[in-house]
Amino acid sequence: YLIEDHSDDSRVGIYYYEYGSYPRKPRVVYDRKHSSINHIEISDVPETMFYNTRLFHTSGITLGLGGNAQKFAIECIKKFKEHGTLISFDVNYRANLWSGEEARACIEQILPYVDIFFCSEDTARLTFGKTGTIEEIQKSFCEDYPISVVASTERTVITPKKHNFTSIIYSAKEDKYFREEPYNNIDVVDRIGSGDAYVSGALYGYLKYKDCQKALEYGNAMAAIKHSVIGDMVSTDLEEIKGIIAEHQNTGYHSEMN
């Protein structure tokens, strides 16, 4: 569904990204004040959407906007959950939107409704005060809340233009961890959006196959290929992703051309 804002002063939120190069880190500046998302109401959403949706996904960025955007996201989570929709949530913590204490207090309110939870190890430790190994951290979220699946990306930055990427997924139902070998020495054109690409791939794999290993493979492949694309949206298709997964799993000869 696409919900449009027809008000005279409607606008879309903007962010400005300044690329970094060692030793200077990249910077993001948000310009979201008075954007349409801050004025949306639950009544703007067609009622049929709550009955016909397999999965609802949102993130800590929306909650971090505060005010009406936060209220709307929480209302959506609760209403979708009432109608049996799977709830997916990515913490996606941004320190220039809110403090760690504010994020934790808000997110812990919605975790009882979440089925699929995306949270990095660093965020789990710094924002939620978790300790132990990443496996213990993931399992603890499922022990504290009725979460079914926890996914955490793992990135090693060799240089700003050379990264390794993989992830680990925990299934509470199976009490099992899923991993694969990392995508090593990724030539980074632009890393912005790789986290969202991972989430989209993981959710596709999970919904399509009902399999956490497939979720892991599609998530990792989507994130890896996103690094090769300028901008915050990945440009690819299903066949290319399947090919990347197959090549990643093949330890033999790799062709340089398709």
Language model features with spans:
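Alpha-helix N-cap/helix-start capping motif
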Residues: 34, 121-122, 196
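Acidic, amphipathic alpha-helical patches
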Residues: 46, 107, 188
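A short acidic, often aromatic-flanked loop/helix-cap motif at beta-alpha or helix-coil junctions
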Residues: 8-12, 126, 158, 186-187
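Conserved beta-alpha-beta core of the PfkB/ribokinase-like small-molecule kinase fold
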Residues: 55, 61-166
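Structural motif corresponding to alpha-helix initiation and N-cap regions
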Residues: 13, 42-44, 100-104, 134-135, ...
